[in-house]
Amino acid sequence: GIYRNNFDAALNTRHGFPVFATVLEANHIAKRDDAYAAFRLTEDDEQEIRALARDDRIGKRIIKSMAPSIYGHQSIKTAIALSLFGGVSKDVGGKHRIRGDINVLLLGDPGTAKSQFLKYVEKTANRAVFATGQGASAVGLTAGVRRDPVTREWTLEGGALVLADKGVCLIDEFDKMNDADRTSIHEAMEQQSISISKAGIVATLQARCAIVAAANPIRGRYNPTVPFSQNVELTEPILSRFDVLCVVKDLVDPVQDEMLARFV
């Protein structure tokens, strides 16, 4: 490569002393370590997968392997397994693309292991990005532009949904987000792309990922006497983009509580 020094007179004037930035112009790049080498399937792995696929109980075995440290919640484990495996995206006539990823929303009472499910997916999925509704903004989830402090040029930076491309994006405390921030992810959840036009930069970023989010109901407890949409502070457009809605209720059941205590 070529080693150069980048000199910016305006930056030097502002700081009051010479400032040089090191720039290395590469002529060739040789990749030494492959981060995904451990995930590549060998012929033995493929034969073992085909053997497992012929098992009539493979579905139950997969669901049972989801978060084994959490007792019960078979419906949630089924939804998470479906989201991790995903579906098949379709390109209709080369003009309209239908996403294959499955978006899941977990809504339930406090202390029902919703966040633990998200943490399990974060550690299990090949590519997973974790974010919280209270600490994430529209720019942090989608994309934004910033000015480089040295070159003073505008650069494009992807958010959590872009970084989770071909993976899973996990959002905890989804109901704590601002309405404007939630509106910004409508395109990413349905079209799986993010369009940005700021500071002279016009681009479309890929966000081909499944979204698994967790939220708390209004007033802390789920009310079964009213519809799902009235139990959570989410608008109808955002709810319609979730394929699976899971409700987790903390019911008083002495038998289940005793079985849970024995499991722990």
Name each model feature, range by range:
Residues I2-Y71:
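OB-fold and OB-like single-stranded nucleic-acid-recognition modules
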Residues I58-V264:
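Conserved ASCE/P-loop NTPase catalytic core
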